[in-house]
Amino acid sequence: MKAIFIINPISGTGRQSSIKFLIKNQINKSIDYQIIETEYAGHGAKIAYENRDITDVIIAIGGDGTVLEIGAPLIGSNTPLGIIPAGSGNGLARHLNIPISLEKAIELINNHKIKTIDTVTVNGTPFLSTMGLGFDAHIAKCFDDYGTRGFWSYIKLIFREYFRYIPKTFDIEIDGTSFQKEAWIVCIANSSQYGNGAIISPESTIDDGQLDLCTLQKPNLLQTPLLIARFFIGNLHKSFLLSRDSGKNIVIRNHFELYHTDGEPATSDKELNIQINPLSLKVLIPNKNG
């Protein structure tokens, strides 16, 4: 098997420093591999695109943003995406039960099976896991601008911005049905979670050909501790503050410009057309029989 490992050296928590040593010592000798470090934004996508038809697997080493950058060029190809999670949230890896441990994630490359998953586009641009608007997108932008990465930086920003952010009313259309919804957070989910074990859409599956639209009302101070607990326990769908719809095509007409895809903030002054692309990306997942 021929493999390319693509490392984002500045992603997430800095665990990448030991990855070359671990790969050298753990990867099967039968695997012909090379390791490439990205040098600029978009470099990982370029490497993946140029090699997708001439290698057996391309492995992204980094966080959700890195996984998206490297995975997007593989959509529609026969080359699977491997993931070694080394970011702050690692949402897609967690959803796919890929180990967060670097050692165990490398072992997965040695002993894996291939799963084909859905992907999503927003105005033609792909993402893999979740898209967020409202407070969700606001925090993603704050986190992107923040000097320190990691889970606790994210939590600090949530508490800092909680009192500042006012819920908004969104114009939404799902498979031709239109409605308005006031919400604190709007999430379009292909997988179940953002990352760090924060599960926004517990009932989402990544290969069902459906998008899940989750709208969350802003909790008051008394409701907040239970809501946070529900995020991490995985039963947010039982909260009366969460509403859920599903469909294949979602349009959001007034989104106040800011949104994020897989944690990466973006802006647009146009309506957002979001479409599911069923079974369009191959990924490596644990081989439970191995």
Which residues are covered by each model-predicted region?
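Glycine-rich phosphate/pyrophosphate-binding beta-alpha loops
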Residues: 132, 187-200, 265
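A generic structural signal for short beta-strands and their flanking turns/coil linkers
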Residues: 166-168, 182-184, 207-212, 246-248
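ATP/nucleoside-binding phosphotransfer catalytic cores, i.e., glycine-rich phosphate-binding loops
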Residues: 16, 174, 180, 205, ...
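ATP/NTP phosphate-donor binding region
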Residues: 1-57, 177, 290
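Short aromatic-hydrophobic micro-motifs that form the base-stacking/packing surface
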Residues: 59, 82
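Catalytic core of DAGKc-family lipid kinases
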Residues: 6, 76-80, 86-184
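N-terminal glycine-rich "phosphate-gripper" loop used for MgATP/nucleotide binding
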Residues: 60-65
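Short Gly/Thr/Asp-enriched flexible loops that form oxyanion-binding sites at enzyme active sites
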Residues: 66-77
